[in-house]
């Protein structure tokens, strides 16, 4: 069984690695799009919205509902990518905890 000092050292090491991974995620951009890429949304890994882009074909004042639906699709697709990358990068730390 590990002594307390070794457990604390290992926990501090894991914390530094996790902070580094979180910073890498925050610096990464994730883009999601709607059907036919008419709307794209880009977020950082810490879920800050960077941009929403609309193709001219989708902007129709008489059909705002379609634009809204496509925007939601693009945002949700981008956030799903962020969540998947976060789980992949940070989920590995859960199994490494010394206790």
Swiss-Prot record:
Top-level division of the source organism's lineage: Bacteria
GO molecular function list: DNA binding
Tagged with keyword Cytoplasm: yes
Keywords: Cytoplasm, DNA-binding
Classification via SUPFAM superfamilies: YbaB-like
Assembly and oligomerization: Homodimer.
Function: Binds to DNA and alters its conformation. May be involved in regulation of gene expression, nucleoid organization and DNA protection.
Family, similarity comment: Belongs to the YbaB/EbfC family.
Stored NCBIfam families: DNA_YbaB_EbfC
Name of this chain's protein: Nucleoid-associated protein SSU05_0194
Species the sequence originates in: Streptococcus suis (strain 05ZYH33)
Taxonomy of the source species: Bacteria, Bacillati, Bacillota, Bacilli, Lactobacillales
């Amino acid at each position: 069984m590990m002594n307390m000092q070794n457990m604390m050292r290992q926990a501090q090491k894991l914390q530094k690695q996790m902070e580094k991974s979180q910073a890498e995620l925050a610096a990464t951009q994730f883009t999601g799009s709607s059907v036919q890429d008419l709307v794209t949304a880009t977020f950082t890994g810490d879920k800050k919205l960077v941009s929403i882009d609309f193709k001219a074909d989708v902007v129709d004042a008489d059909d705002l509902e379609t634009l809204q639906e496509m925007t939601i699709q693009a945002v949700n697709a981008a956030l799903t990518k962020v969540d998947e990358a976060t789980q992949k990068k940070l989920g590995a730390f859960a199994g490494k905890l010394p206790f």
